[in-house]
């Protein structure tokens, strides 16, 4: 199994906690799925903690510290603040997989908007009251497909 690692030279805007967490993840040879199961979170949410894009709860910090053998006080100091979301990726992104996600929004963004507006009215899909998951699907020919589910609360615009 290949594991996601971190090259800090490619991600200079990530918080110190990212290097700490990824180093311990590599040492323990754990996948995000395994770590997520241990802390009781979704694997994408777990990866978001590692990239400094999601807030870790005190319970998350305790469980990560224990699982990854990271000093609790060090991890608590690094993860107890509020995330500075959105700084980790330059726009447009250069990493090919992240660029494909960006490209999906470029190509289908207005189509999604039109369909969502027709179904829900004038509003937006929350990225705060939100969940996501990634699944692997294999078709009859043996081709692997990535299935990404985005689930956000619908927030109608207020009339004032």
From Swiss-Prot:
One GO MF term attached to the UniProt entry: DNA binding
CDD domains, alphabetized: Cyanase_C (cd00559)
Signal peptide range: none
Reactions performed catalytically: cyanate + hydrogencarbonate + 3 H(+) = NH4(+) + 2 CO2
SUPFAM superfamilies: Cyanase C-terminal domain (SSF55234), lambda repressor-like DNA-binding domains (SSF47413)
Transmembrane regions listed in the UniProt entry: none
UniProt-listed Enzyme Commission number(s): 4.2.1.104
SMART domains per UniProt: Cyanate_lyase (SM01116)
Protein's GO biological process: cyanate metabolic process
Disulfide bonds: none
Keywords: Lyase
Keyword Nucleus (UniProt): no
A Pfam family the protein falls into: Cyanate_lyase
InterPro entries noted in UniProt: Cyanase, Cyanate_lyase_C, Cyanate_lyase_C_sf, Lambda_DNA-bd_dom_sf
Residue positions of the active site: 100, 103, 126
Protein's UniProt keywords contain Lyase: yes
Family to which the UniProt record says this protein belongs: Belongs to the cyanase family.
Role: Catalyzes the reaction of cyanate with bicarbonate to produce ammonia and carbon dioxide.
Protein name in the entry: Cyanate hydratase
Organism: Emericella nidulans (strain FGSC A4 / ATCC 38163 / CBS 112.46 / NRRL 194 / M139) (Aspergillus nidulans)
């Amino acid at each position: 199994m290949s594991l996601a690692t971190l090259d800090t030279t490619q991600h200079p805007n990530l918080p110190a906690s990212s290097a700490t967490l990824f180093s311990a993840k590599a040492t323990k040879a754990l996948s995000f799925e395994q770590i997520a199961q241990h802390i009781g979170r979704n694997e994408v949410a777990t990866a978001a903690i590692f990239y400094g894009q999601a807030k870790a709860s005190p319970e998350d910090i305790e469980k990560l510290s224990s699982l990854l053998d990271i000093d609790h006080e060090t991890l608590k100091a690094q993860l107890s603040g509020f995330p500075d979301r959105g700084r980790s990726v330059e726009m447009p992104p250069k990493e090919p997989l992240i660029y494909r996600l960006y490209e999906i929004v470029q190509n289908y963004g207005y189509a999604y908007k039109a369909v969502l507006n027709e179904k829900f009215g004038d509003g937006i899909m929350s990225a705060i009251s939100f969940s996501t998951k990634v699944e692997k699907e294999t078709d009859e020919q043996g081709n692997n497909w990535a299935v990404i589910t985005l689930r956000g609360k619908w927030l109608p615009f207020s009339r004032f």
